[in-house]
């Protein structure tokens, strides 16, 4: 009986933390969606890479909403000893766990396919908005300067852009030499000779270089999810 009470309290506290984290992510997501410029000023290049490939605001709102609901179900289920709510909590967590495993497998096996898919989304945005939408341009400039890369794939992503057509030059990072000193004006010939790597490949390279850390975080998250599922099922099975 004492063990049951202890696990019940731990379940409540653990899910209270998830609930608060979800609320925080929701708040940040709404902030980013409403005022992305100030978010970028506060977090700088820390957030710029991610903002190239996902709409950070909507992503945070979605993740925050899931955590918020999950935390609420866990807290309410443990506190009220409601078997139906505990089963809902377990089911949602199981679906998330399976989706994460599937996503990891797809990311590992179909990296090239993911690159092609993202190219179809990102390159047209570069061609249309770079140099004309302030937030978009600032994010890309920060990313290219911090990661020492050019475009999504390489400098050719800018060939059909309004920016190059009207200014006849490429962004300075596309002409950076190994010492990261830019050669200006950055013409197509100079950009071609410099062979600056695309930002997608650079991000992949950095992720692989930190594979142990990334893997450790993934294993830690998976372990927490498994523990939460085991605890919720234990409470479910021991409730009358």
From Swiss-Prot:
Lipid bilayer topology: Multi-pass membrane protein
Location(s), subcellular: Lysosome membrane
The UniProt record lists the keyword Transmembrane: yes
GO biological process, one term: protein stabilization
Gene3D superfamilies recorded: Tetraspanin
Family of the protein in this entry: Belongs to the tetraspanin (TM4SF) family.
Task of the protein: Structural component of specialized membrane microdomains known as tetraspanin-enriched microdomains (TERMs), which act as platforms for receptor clustering and signaling. Participates thereby in diverse biological functions such as cell signal transduction, adhesion, migration and protein trafficking. Regulates neuronal differentiation in response to NGF by facilitating NGF-mediated activation of NTRK1/TRKA receptor tyrosine kinase and subsequent downstream signaling pathways. Plays a role in the inhibition of TNFalpha-induced apoptosis.
Subunit structure: Interacts with SLC19A2. Interacts with NTRK1/TRKA.
Protein name: Tetraspanin-1
Provenance organism: Mus musculus
């Amino acid at each position: 009986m004492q063990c049951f009470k202890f696990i019940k309290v731990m379940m409540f506290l653990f899910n209270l933390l998830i609930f608060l984290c979800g609320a925080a992510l929701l708040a940040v997501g709404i902030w980013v969606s409403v005022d992305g410029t100030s978010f970028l000023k506060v977090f700088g290049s820390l957030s710029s890479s991610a903002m190239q490939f996902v709409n950070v605001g909507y992503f945070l709102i979605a993740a925050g909403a899931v955590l918020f609901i999950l935390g609420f179900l866990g807290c309410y289920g443990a506190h009220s000893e409601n078997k139906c709510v505990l089963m809902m909590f377990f089911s949602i967590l199981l679906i998330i766990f399976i989706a994460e495993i599937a996503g990891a497998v797809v990311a590992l096996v179909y990296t090239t396919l993911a690159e092609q898919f993202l190219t179809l989304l990102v390159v047209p945005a570069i061609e249309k908005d770079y140099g004309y939408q302030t937030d978009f341009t600032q994010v890309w400039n920060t990313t290219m300067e911090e990661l020492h890369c050019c475009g999504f794939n390489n400098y050719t992503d800018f060939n059909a852009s309004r920016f190059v057509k009207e200014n006849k030059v490429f962004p300075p990072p596309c002409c950076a030499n190994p010492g990261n000193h830019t050669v200006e004006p950055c013409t197509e010939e100079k950009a071609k000779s410099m062979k600056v790597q695309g930002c997608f490949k650079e991000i992949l390279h950095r992720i692989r270089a930190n594979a142990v850390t990334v893997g450790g975080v993934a294993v830690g998250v998976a372990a927490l999810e498994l523990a939460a599922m085991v605890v919720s099922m234990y409470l479910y099975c021991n409730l009358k």
